[in-house]
């Protein structure tokens, strides 16, 4: 594999460490817990001329192997309707209000999960000293069925702490 992609994967795993996404643990009882696989997704970020400016690697959970009642319970997360966004923008324009758009880097990696979820070590980054261990998730991973809900709950709690009301 090319060094640029290895660096991109290492950067992704550094985000996991910074966000305390997981911890390496002994493999749990397979009758009580499912071990969800992981895989790498690769993408080139390009500038306006189509030139590659950055390689991006994202580690995702193979959420299609999750078992309801074991790996997840609640998955619903509300999404803003296009009409609501249009009304907000019209109101902002009419009242000459300055509106900012922001992006949260690795948003789902900030969402705390309630369930006990275990994932396999990432392909190519298995711990040689502990090959039989797995990661217990503290926060959501892209691909998990409950990831959007976990991020929504985290964002909602943050906004409430700043005085916003639902």
Task: Report each predicted region and the residues it spans.
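Long, low-complexity, charge-biased intrinsically disordered regions
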Residues: 1-166
């Amino acid at each position: 594999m090319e060094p640029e992609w290895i660096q991109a994967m290492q950067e992704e795993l550094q985000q996991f460490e910074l966000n305390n996404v997981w911890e390496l643990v002994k493999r749990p009882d397979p009758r009580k817990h499912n071990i969800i696989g992981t895989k790498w997704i690769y993408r080139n970020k390009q500038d306006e001329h189509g030139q590659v400016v950055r390689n991006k690697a994202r580690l995702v959970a193979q959420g299609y192997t999750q078992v309801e009642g074991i790996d997840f319970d609640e998955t619903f997360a509300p999404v803003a309707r296009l009409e609501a966004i249009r009304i907000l923008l019209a109101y902002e324009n009419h009242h000459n209000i300055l509106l900012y758009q922001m992006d949260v880097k690795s948003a789902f990696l900030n969402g705390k999960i309630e369930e006990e979820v275990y994932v396999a070590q990432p392909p190519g980054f298995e711990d040689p000293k502990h090959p039989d261990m797995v990661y217990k998730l503290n926060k959501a991973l892209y691909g998990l069925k409950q990831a959007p809900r976990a991020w929504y709950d985290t964002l909602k709690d943050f906004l409430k702490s700043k005085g916003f009301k639902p």
